[in-house]
Amino acid sequence: MIGPTKKPQDFGFKDGDTHLIVNDITEVMTAYDFHGNKRWEIPCLARGQGSDTDWKHPRTDTPPGLYKLGAVYDDYGKVGLHAACDRTHLAYGWCSFDMVSLDHHEEDAGRAGIMMHGGGSGCGWPGAWAPKQHLVPTFGCVRAYNSDLRDKILPLTKKGTVFVSVFQEG
């Protein structure tokens, strides 16, 4: 497994913050609080359009490394369950979060624009807007169920900093 070279503690990890660990092999995201207590696990993908060990090219797997969640886009909060089909809703689902690279693995791989989101154009409409849409590979982002992003990740962003460690096959 290849993962981050730094830890959340290197960036001021404190009480109220959360550490999400994304394992592309097991397709699971696990949340831990500041004290190391496991909060929950949810299904997710960190899978792109290339081979299982490629994250250095556009549209391939999420680059391994340490990120923090940045800007939050709560489309579900704006339009609710019965949204009209549009490209953003189709591709990104209910909620999306910018992922800010902290250990520069994203930049070192020549990548940019990595996010965590739901949706999935491959699910069609209204499938991409379903609470538990089919998890299809992305162009390099972390994808989780729409309902998990709204109910589990979004509240964490209101409590503190959310750090994300992405682990990939080597």
Where are these regions (language model features)?
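Exported/periplasmic cell-wall-interacting domains
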Residues: 76-170
